[in-house]
Amino acid sequence: MLKEISVPCSLVRDGEFQVMEQCTRIRGADALTYLDREKFLPALGDLNISCVICKPEFAGKIPEHIRGIIFSDDPKLIFFLLHNAVGTFVENVPTKIDSSARISPLAYVAPYNVIIGPRSIIGPFVMVGEGTEIQEDVHIHEGCTIGAQGFTSVRNGDAMFLAKDLGKVRIERGVEICAHCDVARGTLLLDTTVLGAYTKLDAKVHIGHGSVLGKRVLVPSGAHIAGNCVVGDDVWIGVNATVSNRIKIGEGARVSLGSVVTKDVPAGQTVTGNFAIDHARFMKNLKASVLEADSRDNCPPPVDKQD
């Protein structure tokens, strides 16, 4: 019940909720969400939303199916203060490690809420955090962090804090993760960071919270995939590429080395550059720039005319 919330806010109408979700990504029934910008008002039409935290200026614009309403000048702050408080009540289930799994004595596996499947290998100095499921035949090399703290930052006056990660990580069968990679845990309870079957990460790759990688995705060294991205099957992410948050990359697409991806990439397309565009278009633009530069360089020097 909303009336049981012990964070500073103004209860307008009480209501019940089962999950906490961002308004543009509702996946469960009876969801509590927050609204801090008018452009997201249409998202409140989702019938799975039962309660909302919003600014007083949105009074009268809330759909009738939303039973619970809280007013606050900072809805995001109230939402994540509550989210962090809910995290203290998460059930702890003892960790289960298959007898055929090989765990380095120098690795750390959380004592609760971890599952490690048959024949999986956990190397030295690996940290496996709570909420992690590692399926069969997975190999995680030295120095990796699985279930790392994500980077959902929230401002509280002059201070800031990070939202607790209450979601999960799922590493599917046949995945191999090379040295010193970080895979962040999902933030909200229904968020799961996923590495699909037979996906391979090279050294020093970062996978942000809640991102979902499909099957057989290849991510070479130094690439960064920000939070809540969706990457299709058989995608190639090039060396030192950066993928911004909430980006969708379609099946079989390729991101060239060093590219910065800020827009969705259709299936089968290759993108290149900073900011990344279609590879053929990038090469056309590059050739035009080179020809223009050559033309300037080959121009005869101006003649110094004397009277």
Outline where the language-model segments fall:
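Terminal amphipathic alpha-helical/low-complexity segments used for targeting or macromolecular assembly
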Residues: M1-S100, D137, G143-C144, A148-L162, ...
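Structural signal for interior beta-strand "rungs" in well-ordered beta-sheet cores
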Residues: Y34, K96-D278
